[in-house]
């Protein structure tokens, strides 16, 4: 499901009809008592109850998941991602938070200094704290460790926010290939280096 302006403008019933009924053919829907959905969060558990029979599903209300007396919601998770608390996010999700996308062409600066990268846009994702992360990268034919940078590449005076990933042991062209980048650990904030030699040394150290 691609989240965009059109998708976010759906009324609660449109969401139920298109996503729950037609797309997923859901029979049992588990939500917390504070669940909100649809345009401007107009839908809630009473809305779901209202349309149960019409769209042939059963709505089951659960208690919010809490840890240390804090409710763990999608809002809470997004906040942690923005703060770079990736290890905590992964523990709470029960899996690694990831970004999936099609590799786009860059300026090949990474390749020129010996560290080729795969570049992904972050348009449809929560933007993690700018910096360097340990990651796992998955494609149709490999699953490799890597190191990724989220940011603007200040050493090169970059203007566009990108996720750049150096995949260990992979040196081939992956343009237009779909890859999944799973975030494992925040290493350090993004920074500007005096020159390329300093940058290369830091990448090797990372």
Question: Which residue ranges define each predicted feature?
Answer:
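A conserved beta-strand->alpha-helix junction
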Residues: 1-6, 63
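Short, histidine-centered active-site or binding-site loop motifs used for metal coordination
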Residues: 2, 33-35, 185-187
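Classical nucleotidyltransferase
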Residues: 9-116, 194, 198
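Phosphate/ribose-recognition catalytic cores of enzymes acting on nucleotide-derived substrates
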Residues: 104-206
């Amino acid at each position: 499901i691609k989240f965009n302006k059109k998708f976010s403008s759906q009324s609660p019933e449109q969401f139920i009809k298109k996503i729950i009924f037609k797309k997923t053919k859901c029979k049992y829907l588990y939500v917390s008592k504070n669940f909100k959905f649809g345009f401007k969060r107009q839908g809630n558990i009473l809305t779901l109850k209202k349309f149960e029979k019409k769209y042939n599903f059963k709505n089951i209300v659960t208690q919010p998941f809490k840890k240390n007396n804090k409710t763990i919601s999608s809002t809470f998770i997004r906040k942690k991602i923005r703060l770079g608390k990736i290890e905590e996010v992964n523990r709470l999700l029960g899996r690694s938070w990831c970004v999936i996308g099609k590799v786009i062409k860059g300026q090949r600066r990474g390749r020129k200094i010996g560290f080729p990268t795969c570049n992904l846009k972050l348009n449809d994702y929560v933007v993690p704290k700018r910096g360097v992360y340990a990651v796992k990268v998955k494609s149709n034919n490999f699953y490799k460790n890597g190191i990724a940078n989220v940011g603007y590449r200040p050493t090169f005076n970059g203007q566009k926010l990108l996720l750049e990933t150096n995949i260990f042991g992979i040196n081939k062209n992956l343009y237009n290939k779909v890859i999944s980048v799973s975030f494992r650990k925040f290493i350090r904030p993004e920074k500007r280096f005096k020159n390329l030699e300093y940058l290369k040394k830091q990448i090797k150290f990372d």
